[in-house]
């Protein structure tokens, strides 16, 4: 049984959704003066929106809500606030890649309004998971009905690193297993996260393992094998 279903998102998906989102904002006749990207997932969508709508002012703030892929923090919080500026009287669009629980966008919106109560703030996202989100963004490109973990093209190595670590730790707790072949890892990734994860180019698995080795999480014993 798949523990966490995943869905691979392509660059073409991102470009299409960003274009759709920009079109909805333009049609609403509410044009932002400035875009605030929620780091880190909102960076690329926000930049694409600026390009589509001819907006020059783009800043960011970082909200921590998913410290590890597909594992939510107990409470979302602002890690790095918006830089010092005056947003009062401005139309501010807060952008993220996806609204799943809604916590990240809500805390970002409340943060901006608490500092600049006279700002006209709206929110936008490429995707909105309507069945689980506690908050509906003002603008979205694509409504998702069934929850899955979306693997964005800017997050593939990080997701794989987190998934591999989780698998190795849980399997160690259950059976004491510490040595893994690449084939075993691939099979376990498919078992835990579904066959969709096999669409990720195999080169990213190598990058993920290299990062984990640099961070002291795994040790490569020989070609094709790793140790926790």
Regions found by a protein language model. Name each.
Residues 1-228:
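PRPP-associated nucleotide enzymes
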């Amino acid at each position: 049984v798949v523990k966490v279903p995943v869905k691979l998102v392509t660059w073409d998906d991102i470009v299409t959704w960003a274009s759709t989102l920009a079109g909805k904002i333009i049609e609403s006749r509410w044009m932002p003066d400035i875009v605030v990207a929620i780091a880190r997932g909102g960076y690329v969508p926000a930049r694409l929106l600026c390009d589509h709508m001819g907006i020059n002012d783009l800043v960011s703030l970082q909200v921590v809500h998913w410290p590890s892929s597909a594992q939510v923090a107990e409470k979302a919080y602002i890690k790095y606030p918006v830089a010092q500026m005056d947003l009062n009287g401005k139309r501010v669009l807060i952008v993220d890649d996806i609204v799943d629980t809604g916590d990240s966008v809500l805390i970002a919106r409340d943060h901006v309004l608490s500092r600049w109560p006279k700002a006209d703030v709206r929110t936008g996202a490429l995707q909105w998971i309507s069945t689980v989100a506690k908050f509906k963004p003002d603008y979205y490109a694509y409504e998702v009905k069934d929850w899955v973990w979306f693997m964005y093209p800017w997050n593939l190595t990080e997701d794989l690193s987190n998934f591999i670590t989780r698998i190795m730790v849980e399997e160690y707790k259950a059976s004491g297993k510490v040595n893994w072949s690449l084939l075993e890892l691939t099979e376990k990734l498919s078992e835990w996260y579904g066959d969709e994860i096999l669409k990720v180019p195999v080169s990213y698995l190598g990058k993920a393992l290299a990062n984990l080795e640099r961070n002291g999480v795994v040790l490569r014993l020989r070609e094709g094998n790793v140790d926790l």
